[in-house]
Amino acid sequence: MRNTKLFGVFLALTVAHTATLSLSCANDPVYATPSAQTPPVVTAPNTSTQSTTPKTALEWADVLEQSPNPKVVTNADLLARIAATGLPWCVKDKSSGIEMLLVPPGKFVMGMSPGDTQAENNEKPAHEVTLTQPFYLGRTEVTQAQWMKVAGNNPSHFHSGRDRDSMIKKLINEGLTKSEAEAKTAKESADIDSFPVESVSWNDCQQFCAKTNLRLPTEAEWEYACRADVRKPTYGDVDDIAWFDKNSSGKTHMVGKKLPNALGFYDMLGNVFEWCSDIYGAKYYKSCEDGVVDPKGVSEGSDRVLRGGSWIYYSNYCRSSGRGYGDPGNRNGRIGFRVARTP
């Protein structure tokens, strides 16, 4: 049976260069212990929408693409529902430079996927959720460069300046000239600007969002966007879509390098855990059995929801329904976020 403190022994044995990163189990996202209950087969409802909203300009964003690209939005039903909103599909937030994609309203089945033997008690029961409004969601996790543009600092463990001097010396010892070593590390530093920001707390994210008029997605919005109408535990082969312990080389990676889902979102699973706006409730789904509309979680509690898995954890955490949680003041190199906005 899995330890609810997320494999403290495993974390202590992770790759050597993460030794300076706090791996205390007290700071880990926490998951419930799985049960042996056989998951039910759930059929997703019809999610079509009849919106006739006229095409709308957005004062807060620059429009990159008005209509959804069928090469990106590969689900025909989702493509039609996005177009039916009349809203621009792909936009860039002016205050942060974050690229965002439109998610249409609709219904989906939230929680344990049919046949998912790894589903935990807090993912049950699966239940119907209706989201009545479209929303925008960051195409990727917030990057270090985007965070620095707004916050003016970089709290990340994996940041560009951390080991550059020692890397230059190492490259010179390997035969490169000083100028060659500096050029090589400069490129690597530029790449790291596109790594996800991490070591940010839920409270830090709230401050970022207050400055940009963005917000964290609700847990329901997050899972809806992650699934993209897929009722399987993941939206693709986990090695193709996510960075996790077996393929991450013990670190985060540049966003957008794995395959996206059918809505065009990258790294919904793996790379870093993502904060959601909701207060975490372990038994919350039991109150949702009859279906819910625009849910925002429980009203009381101390912890906040975390979703998606991380570069340092097993692949079974990279599941669309997996639910974790953490203290809102918790900062560590396994946790980042992506932003949302209501049009």
List the model feature ranges, each with a label.
Residues L23-S24:
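C-terminal motif of bacterial Sec signal peptides marking the signal peptidase cleavage site
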Residues M1-A12:
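Bacterial N-terminal signal peptides that target proteins for export
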Residues V30-N46:
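Short, low-complexity, disordered segments immediately C-terminal to signal peptides
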Residues K55, D116-T130, V230, S249-K251, ...:
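Surface-exposed recognition segments
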Residues A242-F265, G297:
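A short, contiguous structural element within a folded domain that forms the immediate neighborhood
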Residues S96-V109:
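Mature N-terminal segment immediately following signal peptide/propeptide cleavage
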Residues A44-C90:
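N-terminal pre-domain segments of enzymes
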Residues K55-V72, K107-A119, E128-D239, S277-Y285, ...:
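Active-site microenvironments of metalloenzymes and redox enzymes
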